[in-house]
């Protein structure tokens, strides 16, 4: 487990979270990549943050969980950058993503945030 991963997110919850990311991508707004995700967190625009567990070097995303915690934003850790990039609508992997407008996935994202909060 990477240094920046504070808790294990069960596979079924990861799958639900990635599906909600796809819905938010299609009906709302999603920020993709570490830099855009960092800006969304700092500005308080992110509803939920996704971080891949297979990022190398780890320092690229190491700041995100702590920054999100300071702002009261939940973080979902997903297994691979490819899964995250795919769900975010990219043809390549993505180390991080943030939902800034949930669209039709609003209720699902709130539920996932609550479940992730319980994991901590």
Swiss-Prot record:
Question: What's its job?
Answer: Multifunctional RNA-binding protein that recognizes the K-turn motif in ribosomal RNA, the RNA component of RNase P, box H/ACA, box C/D and box C'/D' sRNAs.
Q: Name one GO molecular function term.
A: structural constituent of ribosome
The cross-references to PANTHER family, in alphabetical order and at most eight, read: 40S RIBOSOMAL PROTEIN S12
Similarity comment: Belongs to the eukaryotic ribosomal protein eL8 family.
What InterPro entries does the annotation carry? Ribosomal_eL30-like_sf, Ribosomal_eL8/eL30/eS12/Gad45, Ribosomal_eL8/Nhp2, Ribosomal_eL8_arc
Q: What is this protein called?
A: Large ribosomal subunit protein eL8
The UniProt entry's GO CC annotations, sorted and at most eight, read:
cytoplasm; ribonucleoprotein complex; ribosome
Give the GO biological process terms.
Answer: maintenance of translational fidelity; ribosomal small subunit biogenesis; tRNA 5'-leader removal
Domain of life of the native organism: Archaea
Known partners and oligomeric status: Part of the 50S ribosomal subunit. Probably part of the RNase P complex.
Q: Which organism is it from?
A: Halobacterium salinarum (strain ATCC 700922 / JCM 11081 / NRC-1)
Q: Which SUPFAM superfamilies match?
A: L30e-like
Keywords (A to Z) from UniProt: Cytoplasm, Ribonucleoprotein, Ribosomal protein, RNA-binding, rRNA-binding, tRNA processing
């Amino acid at each position: 487990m990477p240094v920046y991963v504070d808790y294990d997110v069960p596979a079924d919850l990861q799958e639900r979270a990635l599906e909600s990311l796809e819905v938010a991508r299609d009906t709302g707004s999603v920020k993709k990549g570490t830099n855009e995700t960092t800006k969304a967190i700092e500005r308080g625009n992110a509803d939920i943050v996704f971080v891949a567990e297979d990022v190398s070097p780890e320092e690229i995303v190491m700041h995100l969980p702590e920054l999100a915690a300071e702002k009261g934003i939940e973080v979902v850790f997903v297994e691979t950058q490819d899964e995250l990039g795919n769900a975010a609508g990219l043809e390549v992997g993505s180390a991080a993503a943030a939902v800034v407008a949930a669209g039709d996935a609003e209720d699902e994202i709130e539920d996932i945030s609550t479940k992730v909060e319980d994991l901590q």
